[in-house]
Curated annotation (Swiss-Prot):
It is a multi-pass membrane protein. Keywords: ATP-binding, Cell membrane, Kinase, Membrane, Nucleotide-binding, Phosphoprotein, Transferase, Transmembrane, Transmembrane helix, Two-component regulatory system. It catalyses: ATP + protein L-histidine = ADP + protein N-phospho-L-histidine. The keyword Cytoplasm does not apply. GO terms for cellular component: plasma membrane. This is Putative sensor histidine kinase NtrY-like. The keyword Ribosomal protein does not apply. Its EC number is 2.7.13.3. Residues 378-589 form the Histidine kinase domain. Pfam families: HAMP, HATPase_c, HisKA, NtrY_N. Its main location: membrane. The modification Phosphohistidine is found at H381. Member of the two-component regulatory system RT0603/RT0550.
Length: 599
């Protein structure tokens, strides 16, 4: 039970469903982590927890993928090659990524330190201080001016209180003398303007906050912040009942803009400085995820890429194993690979296997021929010695005692049978001897068309029931060959065709000579019985025959002679009826062979 559960658990753990679920979990966890880091109210314990969860998911996913891949590819040498290539791709992707990540984080920290250097902080702080000092100085000056104007107006109380025109004139004089942009005297009780300078804007107590008026009641100038481009001071006039003086000076807009820009830059700088830890965490996490992503992409690319390389190599390994087991018919599909080095290797492998198969077949045939040659020599030697006396004794018996025998016809029949079978044995022995002692060809120039037609004419005389035809695309052709052996080839081929026609009312043998480029084709077709399908591939082997008159060395001799003349012998059955024998000579190879034999 435990083993069953263990097997199912292993299967489940290595299944594609779990891997897909982990991949989705990794994406969701990464997005959640990024969201948590982006929050303004950060909890670093929570961030670290999410980072650990992300790391665990990625590690488990990587382990499962690696285990699944290597467990699938540990069967043979080609799989181990694929593993090595995938590992190489992973290292090539991981090492530079790690190095770049480390240096990027390092230089990022250096840049951050350079951005938030103490000197820069000091400069920004000093700029803010200078701006604030400028405004503060203007406020102090305006406060002193407000006290001075209030003092002057209090001294002139009895002259001004009942003379509004003089009050206004005096106020304008004070404003011009003290460079005030505005000066206004307000009555709190009536909420009216008692007097004001020429450039002053209309103002009422409703626009002044109550708490500022209370502060002004204490006798000290109070700043009224109603316009960012203007500094105003409110002060109560001592001798007057509920009367207040409001003075103001304009500040240059360029200076205001400069101060605002300085304060904004300083505030943004300090905000970034406070967020630097958050930025560093985001940057580091981003690089970690990019590194992991590149690693997974590299592994997947390595798997796909090596699969394309190793797949044809696996087929080669499989084919090689079959060849090792003795199967020389195996071929790898050349059309399934590109015409590159792998394609060239496929072509070379197929050519090599075909050559090995042909050489093995030729070796078997040669060994069989050599064995039969030895047998032929021994058989010929053992049979030939008693054969001659038997033949001579039979002939003498026929001559000497045929007159004395009462049943003369029967006696002659028996003796003629002995003589006939003895001659058959003699012919068989001659074939043995010819096959065993076939001499090397002696190459001379012979007129091939005449040679073939002459042989056909001779065969016509022996077989008047067979129609012979000869068709040639040239009238004459000088062929470098051993004329005797070529004559023997044609006789054997024609004799084989004649034997297949025996017993038929109508026989036909067609001979075609096709001479073009560097090849000669001699084709012999008949309308006989043809070859049994099971003997098509063995017809040229020694002592394979369907005739009762020979030992089956005729076509074997033909093949040997044709090969000695750099030719190929093909045997097949015609579609309708009969057989076709195609002899093809390669003139280039033949001329090279003749040249080597002469040189």
């Amino acid at each position: 039970m435990l083993s069953y559960l263990k097997q199912n658990l292993c299967f489940y753990l290595s299944s594609k469903i779990l891997i897909l679920a982990l991949a989705i979990s990794a994406i969701v966890s990464a997005c959640t982590t990024f969201y948590v880091i982006s929050l303004e109210a950060k909890n670093f314990s929570t961030i670290i927890g999410f980072l650990l969860i992300d790391l665990a998911i990625f590690l488990i996913l990587g382990i499962l993928l690696t285990q699944k891949f290597f467990s699938k590819n540990n069967d043979n040498d080609s799989s181990r090659l694929q593993n090595r290539i995938v590992i190489a791709f992973s290292l090539v992707a991981a090492i530079p990524t790690i190095i770049v990540s480390v240096f990027s984080v390092y230089f990022f920290n250096l840049s951050v330190k350079a951005w938030f250097d103490k000197k820069i902080s000091t400069v920004l702080d000093q700029s803010v201080i200078v701006a604030e000092t400028y405004i503060a100085e203007h406020k102090v000056q305006l406060k002193e001016t407000a006290l001075a104007v209030a003092e002057d107006l209090s001294d002139m109380y009895y002259d001004l209180i009942h003379n509004p025109a003089l009050f206004t004139k005096t106020l304008n004089t004070e404003a011009d003398m003290r460079s005030l942009d505005e000066a206004i005297v307000l009555n709190k009780s009536t909420n009216t303007i008692v007097a004001n300078s020429y450039l002053s804007f209309s103002l009422s107590f409703a626009t002044i906050p109550a708490h500022l008026i209370k502060k002004a009641d204490l006798g000290e100038p109070v700043e009224v912040k109603s316009d960012p481009t203007k500094i105003r001071m409110l002060i109560k006039l001592k001798e007057y009942n509920d009367v207040y003086l409001l003075v103001g000076r304009l500040v240059d807009n360029k200076i205001i803009d400069h101060i605002d820009a300085t304060n904004g830059a300083a505030a943004e700088y300090n905000s970034l400085k406070n967020e630097i830890d958050n930025i560093q965490i985001k940057f580091s996490i981003m690089f970690i995820f990019i590194a992991l992503l590149l690693l997974f992409v590299a592994i997947n690319f390595g798997v796909l890429f090596t699969a394309q390389i190793v797949k044809p190599i696996k087929k080669l390994v499989t084919a090689t194993d079959k060849v090792k087991d003795g199967d020389l018919t195996v071929q790898v599909p050349e059309n399934e690979v590109d015409k590159d080095e792998i394609g060239t290797l496929y072509v070379a492998f197929n050519r090599m296997i075909k050559q090995l198969s042909r050489q093995q077949r030729d070796l078997v045939i040669a060994q069989r021929a050599m064995a039969w040659s030895d047998v032929a020599k021994k058989v010929a030697h053992e049979i030939k010695n008693p054969l001659t006396p038997i033949l001579l004794a039979s002939e003498r018996l026929l001559k000497k005692f045929s007159a004395e025998i009462k049943d003369k016809s029967e006696f002659e029949s028996y003796l003629k049978m002995i003589i006939r079978h003895t001659n058959d044995i003699k012919n068989i022995v001659s074939e043995f001897v010819l096959f065993a002692r076939l001499p090397a060809p002696k190459f001379t120039k012979s007129e091939l068309v005449y040679l073939v037609k002459h042989i056909i004419e001779a065969r016509k005389l022996l077989n008047d029931n067979i129609v012979y035809t000869c068709d040639s695309n040239v009238d004459q052709f000088d062929f470098m060959c051993d004329a005797t052996q070529i004559n023997q080839v044609m006789i054997n081929v024609l004799k084989n065709a004649e034997e297949s026609i025996e017993g038929q009312e109508f026989g036909r043998i067609d001979v075609i000579l096709d001479i073009k480029d560097d090849f000669i084709n001699v084709i012999v077709m008949d309308n006989g019985k043809g070859f049994p399908p099971e003997l098509i591939g063995k017809a040229t082997e020694s002592y394979v025959t369907t005739s009762s008159k020979g030992m089956g060395v005729g076509l074997a001799i033909v093949k040997r002679i044709v090969e000695e003349h750099c030719g190929v012998l093909d045997i097949a059955n015609r579609e309708d009826k009969g057989a076709i024998i195609d002899i093809k000579f390669d003139l280039k190879e033949l001329h090279l062979k003749v040249r080597r034999s002469c040189g």
